[in-house]
């Protein structure tokens, strides 16, 4: 290992007399360092402010932000999207989703109760990813502080209003859990996508020779 050599800086001359102290003070006060600091201060003073007055003002959130869930309805009809498959309950790593269903007269599952314990939820978004009907999605409401547990996780709090769904007052959800508009372009190719099928000319060259050519080889 190479030996490191350290360069020693010259020691600062000691100031003894009052005249030397005065000169050192003037040099330090009127040096370039002072003007550099003043220039930076003036620049920041006239720069636009980035401070917002929360909660009256809020910064825009990403559409794929993961916060309190939303239960979606079908547009126009207003029916609930959830079919009671229970995939969100099974994949939940924090075990905070609880679904109680029963079989209706049409042999379809009917939802009796759907609760989410927001006190245990880690907002990972797995429930939104696994939902086949885009029934549960991640919203952007992060202000959910409360003094009572009973205010956490009621279905009426998550579910989109039926009137808004019938009037189509809200667009189709494009946040976390939904398919991106340009997902085909962003989809990564698999190794099998690079395998090219052989052309007709290559397949003819690789095909086995005819029986007559084998007979000719045997006679030779």
From Swiss-Prot:
Keywords: 4Fe-4S, Cell inner membrane, Cell membrane, Iron, Iron-sulfur, Membrane, Metal-binding, NAD, Quinone, Repeat, Translocase, Ubiquinone. PROSITE patterns: 4FE4S_FER_1, 4FE4S_FER_2. Its main location: membrane. One of its GO terms (molecular function) is NADH:ubiquinone reductase (non-electrogenic) activity. It comes from Helicobacter pylori (strain J99 / ATCC 700824). It comes from the Bacteria. NDH-1 shuttles electrons from NADH, via FMN and iron-sulfur (Fe-S) centers, to quinones in the respiratory chain. The immediate electron acceptor for the enzyme in this species is believed to be ubiquinone. Couples the redox reaction to proton translocation (for every two electrons transferred, four hydrogen ions are translocated across the cytoplasmic membrane), and thus conserves the redox energy in a proton gradient. Residues 187-220 are annotated as: Disordered. Residues 198-220 have a biased composition (Basic and acidic residues). This is NADH-quinone oxidoreductase subunit I. It is found in: Cell inner membrane.
């Amino acid at each position: 290992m190479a030996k490191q050599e350290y360069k020693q800086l010259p020691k600062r001359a000691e100031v003894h007399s009052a005249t030397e102290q005065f000169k050192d003070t003037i040099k330090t006060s009127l040096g370039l360092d002072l003007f550099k600091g003043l220039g930076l201060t003036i620049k920041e003073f006239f720069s636009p402010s980035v401070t917002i007055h929360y909660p009256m003002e809020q910064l825009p959130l990403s559409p794929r932000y993961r916060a309190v869930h939303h239960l979606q309805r079908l547009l126009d009809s207003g029916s609930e999207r959830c079919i009671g498959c229970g995939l969100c309950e099974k994949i939940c790593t924090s075990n905070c989703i609880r679904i109680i269903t029963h079989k209706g007269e049409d042999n379809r599952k009917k939802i009796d109760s759907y609760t989410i314990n927001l006190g245990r939820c880690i907002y990972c978004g797995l429930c939104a990813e696994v939902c086949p009907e885009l029934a549960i999605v991640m919203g952007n409401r992060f202000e959910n502080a409360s003094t009572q547990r009973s205010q956490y996780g009621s279905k009426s709090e998550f579910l989109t209003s039926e009137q808004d769904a019938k009037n189509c007052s809200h667009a189709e959800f494009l946040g976390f859990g939904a398919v991106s508009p340009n997902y085909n372009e962003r989809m990564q190719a698999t190794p099998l996508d690079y395998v090219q099928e052989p052309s007709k000319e290559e397949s003819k060259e690789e095909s086995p020779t005819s029986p007559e050519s084998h007979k000719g080889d045997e006679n030779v």
